[in-house]
Amino acid sequence: MSEVREFYEANAGAFDRDRGRELMERTYLDALLAPIDAQDRHVLDLGCGAGEPIARYLIEAGCRVTGIDASSAMIALSAARFPDMTWKVEDMRTLALDKRFGAIVAWDSFFHLRVEDQRAMFPIFRAHIAPRGLLLFTSGPAHGEAINDLYGQPLYHASLDPGEYRSLLAANGFEVLRHS
């Protein structure tokens, strides 16, 4: 994980500049928010990056956002854009906020964790989700690890098998509402 953090520290500006703003994630975010009552619209955004476009969309949809990212450079960008929200430099693997959220989003972040760390995240998700809260995360289609090249530097990705994700979710009190 330190390599991923270092990657984003070194490339925050370039990644933010190149990150699409067209919000291809909108369908998933709308499905996440639809059943959540207005008073529960406090979203924990794990691996929030620079806040674009996910946090912006959540904020514009009336959510309060608490964003967590291991990269201080990314958090600085989020805080500059959305100073009324809460932004913290923390490692999601050791998160202990003593707060529960109506929704947790880990979009394009969770898959940067090693497989053993992904397994260990499910109790952390459970500890931070409100009753009837919803969890949205991205993963790969099958168990495996990959190191891609971005900006001439290696960037780690991993995924468990979808069946293992379903088992981990069930063991931690989650029900799969949609998988695609």
Predicted regions: what is each one?
Residues 1-38, 143:
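Conserved class I S-adenosyl-L-methionine
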Residues 112-113:
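A short His-aromatic
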Residues 119-131:
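A short glycine-rich, Lys/Arg-flanked "PGG" loop and its adjoining helix->strand segment in the class I
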Residues 174-180:
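Conserved S-adenosyl-L-methionine
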